[in-house]
Amino acid sequence: MKRRSYAMLRAAAALAVLVVASPAWAELRGEVVRIIDGDTIDVLVDKQPVRVRLVDIDAPEKRQAFGERARQALAGMVFRRHVLVDEKDTDRYGRTLGTVWVNMELASRPPQPRNVNAAMVHQGMAWAYRFHGRAADPEMLRLEQEARGKRVGLWSDPHAVEPWKWRRESNNRRDEG
């Protein structure tokens, strides 16, 4: 009897660890109510706005070349539309990091789910996100290289500056001023 109680206690403890260790989120659904910039949106979920940062991409900043065009491209895909967000994590600013999916209405075919993060990179409106110089997602890097090769979007500018370099230079100018 003691052995069975001990085994059940261990099983319950293991289950509790799994429940606690598993993220409380997996996905969220809602309507996009605001476009912050080319890689950040507000999604209305249960009447509450949730700030979502598109994971694995880095779009130009608002005041950077192509920043407004990236914001407009994202708005064209998702503004006032219902989306599904596959949540990956939360960043240091409290934003949900995730992959955003939207159904695209195509003539003569049923709606097709579209990975908005990938579409932004493929259209040349964002870079594949880098961590310590390496792309976080190899597929995003492939899409970036394809867009670069076709010179679409920001790749039409031969002097396009990566957002992480632009932010660093912008911070340096602010510190000097």
Swiss-Prot record:
Signal peptide: 1-26
Post-translational modification: The N-terminus is blocked.
Catalytic machinery residues: 53, 61, 95
A Pfam family hit: SNase
Domain TNase-like: 27-157
GO cellular component term of the entry, any: extracellular region
Biological-process GO terms, alphabetical: plasmid partitioning
Stored InterPro entries: SNase_OB-fold_sf, Staphylococal_nuclease_OB-fold, Thermonucl_AS
Needed co-factor(s): Ca(2+)
Keywords: DNA-binding, Endonuclease, Exonuclease, Hydrolase, Nuclease, Plasmid, Plasmid partition, Secreted, Signal
GO molecular function: DNA binding; endonuclease activity; exonuclease activity
Activity regulation (UniProt): Endonuclease activity is inhibited by EDTA.
Known EC number: 3.1.-.-, 3.1.12.-
Disruption phenotype: Loss of plasmid stability and partitioning.
Localization of this protein: Secreted
Function as written in the Swiss-Prot or TrEMBL entry: Involved in plasmid partition. An endonuclease that acts on supercoiled dsDNA, converting it first to open circular DNA and then linearizing it. Preferentially cleaves regions in dsDNA that are capable of forming ssDNA, such as AT-rich regions and sequences that can form cruciforms. Has poor endonucleolytic activity on linear DNA, has 5'-3' exonuclease activity on dsDNA cleaving generating 3'-phosphonucleotides.
Further remarks about this protein from its record: Plasmids IncP-alpha RK2 and IncP-alpha RP4 are identical.
Subunit structure: Monomer.
Protein name per the record: Protein ParB
Organism: Escherichia coli
Gene symbol of the encoding locus: parB
